[in-house]
């Protein structure tokens, strides 16, 4: 499945980002979790990631999700948003008063497909800015969303090296045939400012 095959317009994207924000807010304030919108897309299974960034300096505050379509989209958004706000091991759990100083971003993923070319050819099989990548080897794994390469202006090779580091593997791990590399695409929506207008990225 290509990203163009995920039928998500800006209206749905805005609802998805709002659901993520409301879910995190409900968890942090010990309130009832929000209802999932009725739109059919929220009841289809998709991989999804929630990214929370500080505002206005745009530093990562939490990012967790599910690369595989384990959950219906609405449920996946709620879970990933709560985990990003409270369980990202790189950060302390958010406090409720932080909600007005962060933005929420949602990435809705296609199903990952293994990159089956010769390992040395893997950079050529990855489209920077379009593909996200996953590495799996011997119980270790890591994932980088497509927008990471764009944000840090990485080449495909640099993107793969960053993936090896993210997965806790050795430098150049992507050249090793037994390291499984998969790629996926994502449709990304995010708030321009806290509680603000949502745009597609």
Curated annotation (Swiss-Prot):
UniProt cross-references to Pfam families, sorted A to Z: AMMECR1 (PF01871)
Domain AMMECR1: 11-200
InterPro entries attached to this UniProt entry: AMMECR1, AMMECR1_dom_sf, AMMECR1_domain, AMMECR1_N, AmmeMemoSam_A, Uncharacterised_MJ0810
SUPFAM superfamilies referenced in this protein's UniProt entry, alphabetically: AMMECR1-like (SSF143447)
HAMAP family: AMMECR1 (MF_00645)
UniProt cross-references to NCBIfam families, sorted A to Z: AmmeMemoSam_A (TIGR04335), TIGR00296 family protein (TIGR00296)
Protein name: Protein TV1384
Organism expressing this protein natively: Thermoplasma volcanium (strain ATCC 51530 / DSM 4299 / JCM 9571 / NBRC 15438 / GSS1)
């Amino acid at each position: 499945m290509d990203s163009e095959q995920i039928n998500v317009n800006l209206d749905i994207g805005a609802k998805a980002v709002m659901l993520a924000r409301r879910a995190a807010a409900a968890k942090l304030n010990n309130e009832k979790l929000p209802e999932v919108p009725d739109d059919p897309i929220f009841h289809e299974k998709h991989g999804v990631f929630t990214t929370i960034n500080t505002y206005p300096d745009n530093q990562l505050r939490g990012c967790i999700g599910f690369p595989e379509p384990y959950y219906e989209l609405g449920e996946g958004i709620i879970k990933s948003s709560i985990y990003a706000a409270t369980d990202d091991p790189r950060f302390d759990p958010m406090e409720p008063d932080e909600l007005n100083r962060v933005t929420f971003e949602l990435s809705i993923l296609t199903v990952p497909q293994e990159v089956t070319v010769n390992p040395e050819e893997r950079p050529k099989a990855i489209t920077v800015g379009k593909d996200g990548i996953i590495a799996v080897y011997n119980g270790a794994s890591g994932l980088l969303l497509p927008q990471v390469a764009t944000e840090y202006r990485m080449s495909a090779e640099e993107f793969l090296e960053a993936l090896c580091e993210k997965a806790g593997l050795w430098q150049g791990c992507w050249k090793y045939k037994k390291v499984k590399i998969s790629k996926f695409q994502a449709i990304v929506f995010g708030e321009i400012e806290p509680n603000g207008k949502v745009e597609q990225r």
